[in-house]
């Protein structure tokens, strides 16, 4: 679910973000097959919320098999980014404060739950609901400060994962190794040509979204601003030790937690757990990942019905992300919510000029 090039935004400046998508790049159908007759619903929202990608498309895309040739060239920006965050998190025991822990947990929900699970995944990748432009920008921003790459990177990789789930072409299948699926797939280097073809094919809607492109190009800026705010606030209102504590716990520790919980959806939820639906991939429902990842761990349910806003399909499969979507819908900030396995079951709220802004 995470981008392999989250910190290399400069490599995309010549990647053709203004390029459009041809009708030949889309078709109906595709994706993960299920035993139930849900093709019209369950197999949508891979290429964009209204269609799928073809088996053809650009000839050059990032390679994703776990092979020795990959390790000839590493994507050093990603290695340094992820490695540096983990090293910084090792300082956490020496700068522990209860307020730092509280900030860590709060930002874990804000960036991981609202940003990644709700924003990147259910809204931008699958179109499980619609919202206003300001809210869409906000969720994309929160997803970005999770540290998992820009929305363009993240969504492109995840849509490709659904199109080739646990088959040749899946960026992170455990069939290539558990650690590969968990995090090693992020590090091999890709050329600008490969990256441009990849994003054009799998995220053509987002590369034409000015707000999302802006967040992509300013990915690192938001982390610098957040880190400065945490350090400055703790230092100003308390002391230097508290400022450093807030920085380490609110940025580094929180990012490591969000990283690995997201990665567990890619790895553990394709290896262990139970299945409610007979799909053509290895997706599983894993209760503890479901709890840690705000409902994302009910992964077999999701692969069976990809656009469905609710990932928990049984009463005891808790899905906090869906609860937030329901809350947004109740106040008119979400509509066209895909509530059921057969599509949108409720009429959208009356639209006004304000919530269309």
Regions from the PLM with identified roles:
Residues 109, 122, 267, 271, ...:
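Catalytic glutamate of the conserved HExxH
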Residues 203-210, 272-298, 304-305:
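Active-site-proximal inter-transmembrane loops
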Residues 258-276:
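C-terminal accessory segments of proteins
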Residues 3-7, 269-272, 294:
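Short Pro-Cys-Gly-centered "Cys-loop" motif that presents a nucleophilic cysteine in a tight turn
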Residues 111, 115, 269, 291-293:
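Short glycine- and Lys/Arg-enriched binding-loop motifs that mark or flank ligand-binding interfaces
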Residues 262-265, 285, 302, 321:
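Short amphipathic alpha-helical surface patches that serve as generic macromolecular interface elements
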Residues 1-263, 308-357:
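Non-catalytic, topology-defining segments of multipass membrane proteins
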């Amino acid at each position: 679910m995470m981008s392999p090039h989250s910190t290399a935004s400069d490599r995309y400046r010549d990647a053709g973000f203004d390029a459009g998508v041809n009708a030949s790049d889309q078709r109906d159908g595709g994706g993960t097959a299920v035993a139930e007759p849900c093709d019209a619903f369950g197999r949508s929202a891979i290429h964009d919320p209204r269609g799928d990608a073809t088996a053809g498309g650009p000839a050059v895309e990032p390679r994703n098999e776990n092979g020795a040739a990959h390790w000839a060239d590493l994507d050093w920006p990603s290695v340094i980014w992820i490695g540096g965050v983990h090293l910084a998190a090792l300082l956490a025991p020496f700068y522990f404060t209860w307020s730092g822990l509280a900030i860590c947990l709060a930002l874990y929900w804000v960036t991981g739950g609202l940003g990644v699970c709700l924003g990147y995944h259910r809204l931008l990748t699958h179109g499980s609901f619609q919202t206003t432009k300001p809210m869409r920008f906000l969720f994309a921003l929160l997803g970005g400060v999770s540290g998992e790459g820009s929305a363009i990177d993240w969504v492109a990789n995840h849509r490709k994962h659904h199109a080739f789930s646990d088959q040749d072409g899946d960026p992170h299948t455990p069939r290539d190794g558990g650690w590969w699926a968990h995090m090693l797939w992020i590090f091999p280097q890709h050329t600008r040509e490969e990256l441009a073809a990849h994003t054009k094919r799998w995220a053509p809607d987002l590369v034409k979204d000015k707000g999302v492109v802006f967040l992509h190009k300013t990915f690192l800026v938001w982390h610098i601003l957040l880190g400065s705010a945490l350090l400055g606030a703790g230092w100003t209102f308390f002391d230097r030790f508290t400022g450093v504590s807030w920085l380490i716990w609110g940025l580094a520790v929180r990012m490591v937690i969000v990283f690995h919980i997201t990665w567990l959806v890619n790895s553990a939820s394709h290896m262990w757990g139970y299945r409610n639906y007979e799909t053509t991939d290895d997706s599983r429902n894993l209760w503890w990942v479901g709890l840690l990842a705000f409902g994302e761990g009910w992964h077999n349910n999701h692969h069976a019905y990809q656009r469905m806003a609710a990932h928990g399909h049984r009463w005891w499969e808790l899905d906090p992300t869906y609860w937030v979507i329901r809350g947004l819908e109740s106040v008119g900030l979400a509509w066209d919510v895909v509530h059921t396995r057969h599509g949108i079951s409720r009429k959208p709220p009356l639209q006004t000029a304000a919530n269309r802004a």
